[in-house]
Amino acid sequence: MVVRSLQDLHRSLAQTPLRAESPGSPAGSAPLKLFIRQPFTESGEAQQRLIEQILQIIDTANDPRCPFNYLTGTRAESADTFRESFERDRRQPFTAKNFRDYRLKLLNQADALINIRVGMSESSAFELSYHIFKGQCSPNLFLVWKHAPIKTTLIRDLDDLCEVTYLEFEHADELREGIRDFFHMLSTRRAAAPIPVIHS
C-alpha cells in the first residue's frame, strides 16, 4: 500500500491553481458534504473513543469559507450503539435494507469520503466499492490505525480508480496536519473551480 506523506499533500496543494476571489464572491461557500465511514460491528469501546478523537480533529479543519455538512453525523458509534442510533435518528426499524438504503443515499451526495479504519469492517469495503463504481467517486481519505492495517489487496493502491490519500497513525493527534492539508486541498480546488453562468 502506498501511504501518502504530508509532503505529497503539500505538493498537491502547490500544483492546485489559485483564483483570486472578488469581495462577496460565493465561490467555496457551498458546504462540503462529508461521508465519514467508521466501523460498527467490530468496534468496541476503545475504538469508539479513538473514533471520537478523530472526529474532533476533523472538525478542527472545518472552515467557514467551505463549511462541512456532516452527512453521517459526528457521533462515534460502536457495535453496541449504532443500531439504536439509527432507529432513533431515522424513526424506522433497523434492517439490513433500511440501513443500506439510507447509507447509499448519503453516499450519492458525498463530496468526500473519509474512511476511519480502526478495525475490520466488511461494510466499509462494500460502501467504498459503491462510491467508486456507482456513486460520486469523489476524493477518499483513509485514516488507517497501525493496529488495523489494510490487508485486503483489492482496497489498497486505489489511485488508478479514484483520488485517494492514505494516512497511517498510532495516536489520533498524529493525523492533525494531514487532515488539515487534505481539506485545505479540497477547499482550494473548489475555490479555483469556474463559477457556472446562469442565463436569465
PLM regions with names:
Residues M1-S200:
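Conserved catalytic or regulatory cores that recognize and/or transform ribose-phosphate-containing ligands
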